[in-house]
C-alpha cells in the first residue's frame, strides 16, 4: 500500500508521558545503544544553529558521492517527491551502508549527512526490535532504502496526500523503498520539534531521531513485503510508533479514540484523527505482541513471519504467467520470479489493489490466536473479530 506516514510531534508531550513499555506492550529499539557513528550536537533551540553545530561522523562524510547518476524513483507509489524532479534534485548524494540520501529544493550536503547518520543509527535498533539479521544491506539484506530530504516539507504534520504539510512519508517504490522527510535545515523544524536541543536527546519518541526510527520501521516492513506494499494503516502505524516508542498517553485517551471511530476498517485506510489514533494503533500492536496480562503474546520479533505470510498470500493472488506476446509494464515485473508479473501492481499513483487487502486479512486470520482459536481481523470475518472487540480487549489489556 502506497501510504504516507509522518511521526506526530505532539505538543502535549507532558500529557502523554506514559511510554509503551509501561503499558505492557514490549517496546522496540531503545533510546540509547546501537548508536554507532552518531554525530555530536551543541545545545541550542534553533534548528539552523543545531544543524550548524552538528559534527558529522567521518564515516558518513566519506559516503558523499558527487555526480550521482541514479534516480529517486517513485514509480506509481503515492509519494510525490521533489527528489524525483531532475530540475530540483541535487546530483550529490550520501550513499551510506543502508540508505542513499538525495536532496531537493536546495537542501545542503550537511542535511543529507545528518539524515544518513540518523537513519544509520536507527537501522540496528529497528533490526533488533523486529528480530532481523544484523548483517546485510537495508532491511532485506540487499537493497538500500532511498531517502529524500526536502527543506520545504514540514509546514504541517499531515498524514496523506502531497505538498509541504508532510513531515515524513514512506512507500513501496519500484525496486526500493522510498522515504522523504523534512530536512533539518527546514524553516519548519522548530515548529515540528519545539525546543529541541539535539537530534537525539529529549523525550523518547518525540525527537527528530525518532522520525527516522518511525519511517525506518515502515521501510523495514515494506522491504519484507517487496514487491507488494500493502498492509493496513493501523498495522503500519502501530508498528512504527511501537518501535519509535511514541509516548502512548492514558488508558482513557486510548479507549476514547477507539470508541470514537473504527480504527480497523475493512478497507485498510487510516481512520480518525492521527493525533489520537497513533497511540491507539500502538496499543493495538502491544495487545497483539505482549505477554503481559491481556496480551496475545505473539512477540514483536515474530512480526516478520506474519509479513512473510502476507507476502506469500499476495504472491499467490497476484502472480501470473506473462502471456505470450505481452510485454508487461516494467513496474509489474520488479521483484517477481522470472516469467511472472504482478497483476496487483498499482496502475495509478497510490492505488492499492483489493487483492492485497484480502491477502492481509487472510494472513492475519491465519496468524493470530486468542484463547486457542484464530483471532479474526475484521467484523466481516466474525462477530468476535479484533475490529469488533478492540475496545473490550484494550480495556482489559491496558493498565
State the predicted function of each range.
Residues 2-11:
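Bacterial N-terminal signal peptides that target proteins for export
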Residues 19-22:
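C-terminal motif of bacterial Sec signal peptides marking the signal peptidase cleavage site
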Residues 81, 85-219, 223-224:
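Juxtacatalytic substrate-recognition/specificity segment
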Residues 35-102:
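N-terminal low-complexity, Pro/Thr/Ser-rich intrinsically disordered segments
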Residues 44-47, 60-76, 315-399:
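Beta/coil-rich, acidic/histidine-enriched accessory regions frequently appended to metallopeptidases
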Residues 224, 229-272:
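Post-HExxH zinc-binding segment in Zn-dependent metallohydrolases
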Residues 127-150, 227-233, 252-257, 296-314, ...:
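Surface-exposed patches in mature extracellular/periplasmic domains of secreted proteins
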Residues 24-28:
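Bacterial signal peptide processing site
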